[in-house]
A protein has these predicted regions:
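Class I S-adenosyl-L-methionine-dependent methyltransferase catalytic core
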Residues: 1-176
Length: 176
């Protein structure tokens, strides 16, 4: 469904995809060393679906979609502290570096978000967190989400802009 919404013009050319279900910490270890030419992923955004006042949660409820993927303590969406979440996510994506061939690329699709009044620069935090794993930023693209509606957050007391885009981090595996 998401592919049809985000890249509907390209949907006709998508042949097949392999989907593996499980804990990414375990699944990534099953990949053979230097076996991948490209990695693309869109990881969870911390625990934003748990927040009562979050628009994404309200939207998911209105469409009868899950707002909690699991109650498992290892679920990234259940980690209460952002710093711990970022560390865990970086370690999972960093482990992809073993399977990704040298000098090949990983694209990570993320969105910045708000945690109450704090604006979290998730894309920048994640890019920095991946540097110790041998991933260097090579580019940043913006994915405009033209299907999202505009909401007057904070009006008339504050300016709170909507987030109508995601970032695509283009990272290169610089291991030799």
């Amino acid at each position: 469904m998401r592919l049809r919404t985000e890249v509907r013009d390209l949907w006709a050319t998508a042949d097949s995809q392999e989907v593996r279900v499980g804990d990414a910490r375990i699944l990534v270890r099953e990949l053979s060393a230097d076996s991948l030419d490209f990695v693309v992923t869109s990881p969870p955004y911390w625990n934003i679906l748990h927040k009562e006042d979050h628009k994404a949660k309200q939207e998911r409820v209105s469409h009868d979609l899950d707002t909690r993927y699991s109650d498992h303590k290892h679920d990234l969406g259940n980690i209460p502290k952002y710093e711990t979440f970022l560390y865990e996510l970086a370690s999972i994506l960093g482990a992809c570096g073993k399977a990704l061939k040298p000098k090949k690329y990983m694209a990570v699709i993320v969105s910045d978000f708000r945690d109450k009044s704090r604006f979290v620069l998730f894309h920048a935090d994640l890019a920095h967190a991946l540097e110790p794993y041998g991933f260097e930023m090579r580019g940043l693209s913006v994915l405009y989400q033209r299907h999202k509606r505009i909401f007057p957050y904070g009006y008339p007391y504050a300016y709170v802009p909507n987030i109508h885009h995601q970032f695509i981090l283009i990272l290169q595996n610089v291991k030799k």
